[in-house]
Amino acid sequence: MRPEVREEFAAVAARLAGDEAFTTRLERFYTELRDPLVALYGDDPRFRPQFAALLDAMAATARDRGADLRRLDHEREITPDWLHREQAVGYVCYADRFAGTLQGVRERLPYLRELGVTYLHLMPLLAARREPNDGGYAVVDYGRVEPALGTMDDLRALAADLRAHGMALCVDVVLNHTAREHAWAQAALGGDAGKLAYYRTFPDRIEPDEYERTLPEVFPDISPGSFTWVPELARWVWTTFNAYQWDLDYTNPEVFRAMAEVMLDLALTGVDVLRLDAVPFLWKRIGTNSQNQPEVHQLLQALRAMARIATPAVAFKAEAIVAPEQLVAYLGTGRHEGKECDLAYNNVLMALLWSTPSARCCTRDRTPCPRGGPCPGRRRAARGRRSPRP
């Protein structure tokens, strides 16, 4: 730790003293948490109070984790490959289609255990707007389960039962956007300037037109363009996916802190893996496709360090539907290797795994992407997504 950072850390550790394990992890990963955030926000006067609030939330989360979660934190600290072992078997489903409710999922855990499942990914289950809602990815409340599925208490009980059966629980957290009906967006519509600053909005078409010169359309048929005029705001809102999904503004350190706390709260329910939805889109830049920007990886590095300090049992899975040569970066590369996400979707490989048996042909699987170069004959990767989706 650099001397100037050591002095800063000492003040933080003194303020948050009380949990020896937390303080030890904080010292170990403090630089990994601090440095990317300083690079992103260091010149922003809002940063220091938001960073202090984040540290407080991390300390509170670590303190509030029950004995079983603390034990799991310790176990996974000493076995960091727990998610990558060859014995792992994953099962992905929609809770309502599989068992009706979260309680129904609990009742079917013996069946999943019989199958050898060690990892259960329940597709989006947080409260979403009424349809259309992008298959549940237009979230109105990160702190509430979709009412038809149950409650947050049901989610906690399910997570505990899964642990008892030796299974991990994965849930989706939508980082790029919220539904228009989310409390933050509603506050913005009501005139709250602070909450308006949570979103990417523009008073005219000057900047949107500049961005759209190089932006691909995700849903050109049903939601053309990447900006939506909102009369109540008299502003253009960035809407990468649908008009009802408002993109968050991660140049605002308060947004980072708020979404980090969403992740901490989900970790407190006992969730083991957070599937980070649409992560390539988190940072926008004129003259690019506003995907896979370097700042996206700095955000992920800070979130990974946060989890290692406050909730070390929790892993990250990146939903980055990008070309294979761009995908590896979401696991961390160079000096950041292993410091972003633990898993990432390989969309090309997934498609090949399905197309090979259906076409009764395996030749195209032999070289899905040559090392160090683009895939031969590969069409532009689809940047959109369809519901249901992985």
Each language-model region and where it sits:
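Phosphate/diphosphate-binding loops
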Residues: 315-318, 360-377
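Active-site-proximal substrate-binding groove within the catalytic cores of carbohydrate-active enzymes
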Residues: 371-390
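Acidic/aromatic-lined carbohydrate-recognition and catalytic surfaces
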Residues: 1-251, 256-257, 264, 268, ...
